[in-house]
Design a protein with these regions (language model features):
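Basic- and aromatic-enriched surface patches that contact anionic nucleotides/nucleic acids
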Residues: 2-24, 28, 41-242, 324-332
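Glycine-rich phosphate-binding segment of PLP-dependent enzymes
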Residues: 32-39
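A generic structural signal for well-ordered alpha-helical surface patches
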Residues: 56, 221, 288, 292-296, ...
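Short amphipathic alpha-helix initiation/capping segments at coil-to-helix junctions
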Residues: 155, 213, 255-262, 283-291, ...
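Short, mixed-charge aromatic SLiMs
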Residues: 187-189, 243-256, 312-331
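Small-residue-rich helix-loop
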Residues: 235-277, 283, 290
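C-terminal hydrophobic structural anchor segments
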Residues: 270-323
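Eukaryote-biased recognition of C-terminal alpha-helical segments
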Residues: 318-350
Length: 350
């Protein structure tokens, strides 16, 4: 084991972590959520997994002054806080203290918490917050919770890494779901808008679960990143997409042009491929690498100054071409394979 190489690797991978720590009372946290100063990430509603007993145990711990795990936040550019780790605890506090409107705003499936399953404070079972003695209410509201806040001087890559490592809500998050929480701004909103485009939805077939976990937005992200920067792609798709999204979050002057390109690409594909980007008898699912090859090749052709006429029959034929099948199966995550797939489609549409 080479200690110098180990030290060098550590130094090369260290990034500036800039954070602040606070002790904030339950009441202050609740007020900040009400006022929109803490974003519990409504895109993560499906990830609230605690049942009433688990929620009640947190309330019991706070009343008794038993330490609870730190909350971890990231500061946005508008100085609001985004939850990285602590969704379950904060949503529980809202369910216990909030009215129906706030509870539904925070978690569409949320209901007012009635304490149950408590062992140490079993006299509080079947109680809402409003049923507690005033002294117990005050005790609960003034309990401090440690909050660590990653400030906005920390880079996007660090935020992504921390969210991926620290989010322990009990449900594995899709990488795009994490991006939607880390890379906030105009470009993220643009991706979500494109993902609702009806022509895109008609052309790209995916399961309901894939739609719920951010796959649609990731396909849109792949479309633009491979269209613009595929020469920068090496092997790791996740890192490539993260880098591209970070770049566009900082500056996105191409929004109008890219919106037009996206709409024209998928309008043409819907016209040319009425059944969508599908292969053989599997008409209910779009293979991801086939999506990349067909959509990027089509976009390239549309933006080519010597634009050729796209032919429906040629496009249908290329979908089921045996050579393209070889290029879209097996080890496909390399720049060479990506380029080959796209060029193959373009050449066969000529």
């Amino acid at each position: 084991m080479n200690s110098n190489k180990i030290q060098e690797q550590i130094e090369n991978n260290r990034r500036s972590v800039s954070f602040d720590s606070y002790d904030i009372t339950v009441r202050q946290l609740f007020d900040m959520i009400q006022e929109g100063l803490i974003d519990i990430a409504p895109e993560y509603q499906r990830h609230f997994v605690w049942d009433e007993v688990r929620q009640s145990q947190l309330i019991e711990s706070l009343i008794l002054g038993i330490p609870v795990p730190n909350l971890f936040m990231a500061t946005n550019k508008d100085s609001s806080w985004e939850v990285i780790d602590g969704l379950q605890r904060l949503t529980t506090i809202v369910n216990f203290l909030g009215d129906e409107q706030l509870i539904k705003k925070t978690n569409a499936n949320g209901i007012k918490l009635k304490l149950k399953g408590l062992e140490k404070l079993d006299t509080l079972n079947n109680s809402f917050f409003e049923d507690l003695p005033k002294s117990v209410q005050l005790m609960f509201m003034t309990r401090p919770v440690r909050v660590t806040v990653l400030n906005d001087r920390s880079d996007f890559e660090l935020r992504y890494d921390l969210f991926e490592r620290l989010n322990t809500g009990g449900v594995t998050l899709h990488p795009q779901e994490i991006r939607n929480c880390v890379y906030l701004g105009k470009f993220k909103d643009f991706l979500q808008e494109c993902a609702e485009n009806q022509d895109f939805l008609d052309v790209v077939k995916m399961t309901k679960n894939a739609e719920r976990t951010g796959n649609r937005e990731e396909l849109v992200l792949k479309f633009f990143s491979y269209y613009e920067d595929r020469e920068l792609f090496v092997h790791s798709v996740k890192e490539f997409l993260n880098d591209y999204m970070a770049k566009k979050t900082e500056s996105f002057p191409e929004q109008t042009a890219y919106k037009s390109l996206f709409e024209e690409t998928f309008a043409r594909l819907k016209q040319l491929l009425p059944q969508g980007i599908v292969r053989g008898n599997r008409t209910n699912i779009t293979p991801l690498v086939l999506f990349e090859a067909i959509s990027i090749a089509t976009a390239d052709i549309i933006t080519d100054e010597n634009q050729q006429i796209l032919d429906s029959q040629k496009l249908q034929d290329v979908l089921n071409n045996a050579e393209l099948t070889k290029l879209t199966t097996g080890a496909t995550n390399s720049r060479n394979k990506l380029t080959q797939r796209i060029n193959f489609v373009k050449e066969h549409l000529a």
